[in-house]
Each structure stands twice: as C-alpha cells, then as structure tokens.
C-alpha cells in the first residue's frame, strides 16, 4: 500500500468515529472560547429540534461541522439542510465526481472540516488516492479520467475566473446532461458557502486529529 493509500485509509477510519466535540477541541487547542459552543440535542429549543433530529439521522458528525452554526438560524438551516440533502443524495452527478467537486472547493478554501469529512467519502466513491493526494498538495492531479478532468477544469474555472470557457462548456455538454451541468455548478457553489460557514464559525477537526492543512499552507 502506497503512502497516499495509507493516508486515505487513516482518514476513513477517523471519519467513521465522527467528532461531536470538535468545537470544544478548538477552544482547548487555541485557548479561545468557541464562537459557537457545540450544541447537543437536549439544548435545542422547539424551533431547532426538528432540524436537529433530521441532521442526526444522516450526519456522520452529529450536530458539529456546518450544522452547529446553522442551528442558530433554524429556518435558514432547514432550507440549507434540504439543499444539502439534494446535493449529496439526490443529485444527478455521479457520487465520485460530486465528491471530487466538493474536495476541489475544500482545497481552494483550505477548509479543514470540509476536507476531513469528504476525502474519505471521495475515496469510498472510487476517487483514486493519488488524485486526492495530489489535489491536497495543490497540484492539478495527473492520471485523471476524462470525466474527472472535466470536473476539475469546470469547477476550477468557474470558481477562479468566474466563468466557464466555451471550450470547457463544450466538453461538459459531451459528458453531462443539462441537469448534471446545473447540479455540478450548484454543488460547487454550495460548498463554497459551507466553507464560508465553517471558516466564520472556526469549526475544526476532531479532538486529537491533525488538521489536513498546516497553518499558512497555500
């Protein structure tokens, strides 16, 4: 097993354990009080509880990650949860490519939680450990299949140049349906928002787990 495979395997094991106390870890590690102390189900009020119950049915992180700040605005949180649900479990984009798009956004934002949560999911969906490792190193991954290269170019162009070139769009039309192109665009935009939410709230990785990206890493 190569080093990339070992790294992905360790992430998968860590993700399976979840991290309900992630925000508490942030306070201990930095000496700062968390911006949003971690909520538990018994702390939720009548407006928050329905959302919390839905989150707990599907979330590998409990009420942590983006859900912790989202619960502070439960009406918005419910609408975001419904969007997340579609973009994770009902999207027309194949799971491997969907998770690849999420990782591209996670790497651009150096989003510790986003990468920590989704790298194992991408690997489980069949994305090569080498592709994941090269993306993490901020390289254009080598050895990508045509559809993977298209997702990389489409998402990267859209988020860094604020447009999709005619050439890349023509490639997309050969590989994806109109619905898939729209869904791919939506998942990229959604996970920019998730990265923003995580950054604003200073949500972090699980207790005792090294963040994927070092401080100051570009």
Where are these regions (language model features)?
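Bacterial N-terminal signal peptides that target proteins for export
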Residues: 1-15
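Hydrophobic alpha-helical segments
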Residues: 20-218
